[in-house]
Swiss-Prot record:
Belongs to the class-II pyridoxal-phosphate-dependent aminotransferase family. Histidinol-phosphate aminotransferase subfamily. This is Histidinol-phosphate aminotransferase 2. It comes from Bacillus anthracis. The keyword Ribosomal protein does not apply. The gene is hisC2. Its cofactor is pyridoxal 5'-phosphate. NCBIfam families: hisC (TIGR01141).
Length: 366
């Protein structure tokens, strides 16, 4: 049996290892998962309370158009319901966009170190992928603009960026958008939008009034703590959303997920508290890194990236101490946890870097 030739160069997405998988390698003790940027505090208590009180007929299909959820999102964001598209997580939304827009001979442009699903789905559709290196961990929009051509159908911008946690500011993004043809779709993935505290972070939704070629993505998997429910959404021009709905699978968001997301979206106090605690957690890591002269990227997300050469060693040290983090070829990404969890990881990092310094001194004196 034959499949698309382009699939031969791809591998299935590999998520962070689960505690169960870690036990098979590192022994049967408890693990704290800090690899997938999930909310360590879970979701709003309102969600749990309301779901326990409500009754859903599990024999019936969900609302295929996610009408109540889309209207709730639209009301809060001050857009029309027809401008909102819901998917089973942003992974499905990215797949829908790629399937609807791309064809063989087209190309996409994005960063070299960013969310891998942009590249993954472009290759499946037979497209060229133009990847531009980050500039000190940040999207280089000037360089991206220089490689966009007439065959560029999508520019993907992850803002804040995963895995570095960095962001493109309002001035740079607006300037970039002004220089891109209306024939090229600019997708701005704001999965970590709720965590942002930077004053010059761009507010992208008002840009939709002027630019029909902008699509903004957000999710309930991160700050809202609903990763297991799989709900993400896109906001864009009505005509584009209508076309994307053509490739959307019927009944793609479950009834339970729609209800949970609708409830969660109304609990602003919960999100405010999550952002406050997350900001404190980031300061824990930043203070430690500054005191010990360990490189890190200033993060606007719920994780921190350390661009170090020995990421594999750090991963192993954390794993043996019961912490699951995410290794990369050029560093490690650590999800911000509870204060106690952060202290635990920092203790491991402290010991690791002290051991490396001691080893370097011993080698120099040998």
């Amino acid at each position: 049996m034959q499949v698309k030739d382009q699939l031969s160069s791809l591998q299935p997405y590999k998520p962070g290892k689960s505690p169960e998988q870690m036990k098979e390698v590192y022994g049967d003790h408890s693990f704290v998962k800090l690899a997938s940027n999930e909310n360590p505090f879970g979701c709003s208590p309102r969600v749990l309370d309301e779901l326990q009180k409500s009754w859903l007929d599990h024999a019936l299909y969900p609302d295929g158009g996610a009408t109540t959820l889309r209207q709730t999102i639209a009301n809060k964001l001050h857009v029309k319901m027809e401008q909102v598209l819901c998917g089973s997580g942003l992974d499905e939304v990215i797949q829908m966009i790629s399937r609807a827009v791309l064809k063989a001979g087209d190309n996409i442009v994005t960063a070299g170190a960013t969310f891998p699903q942009y590249r993954h789905h472009a290759i499946i559709e037979g497209c060229e992928v133009k990847e531009v290196a980050l500039n000190n961990g940040v999207y280089d929009l000037d360089e991206i603009s220089s490689v966009v051509d007439n065959d560029t159908k999508i520019v993907w911008i992850c803002n804040p960026n995963n895995p570095t946690g960095t962001y493109v500011n309002d001035r740079k993004l607006t300037q970039f958008i002004e220089g891109i043809s209306e024939n090229t779709l600019i997708v701005i993935d704001e999965a970590y939008y709720e965590y942002v505290t930077a004053k010059d972070f761009p507010e992208t939704l008002p840009l939709l009034e002027k630019h029909k070629n902008i699509l903004v993505l957000r999710t309930f998997s991160k700050a809202y703590g609903l990763a297991s429910f799989r709900v993400g959404y896109a906001v864009g021009h009505e005509e584009l959303i209508e076309k994307l709905n053509v490739v959307r699978l019927p009944f793609n968001v479950s009834s339970l997920a729609q209800k949970a997301a609708t409830i969660a979206f109304g609990d602003d106090e919960f999100i405010e508290e999550i952002v406050r605690v997350n900001t404190e957690g980031l300061r824990q890591y930043e203070s430690f890194c500054k005191e010990n002269e360990i490189p890190f990227y200033q993060s606007q997300t719920n994780f921190i990236f350390l661009p170090v050469e020995n990421g594999g060693e750090i991963y192993e040290a954390c794993a043996h101490a019961g912490f699951i983090i995410r290794p990369f070829p050029n560093g490690v990404r650590i999800t911000v946890g509870t204060r106690e969890q952060n202290e635990g990881v920092i203790s491991v990092l402290q010991q690791h870097f002290e051991n490396k310094k001691r080893k370097s001194r011993d080698e120099a004196n040998a």
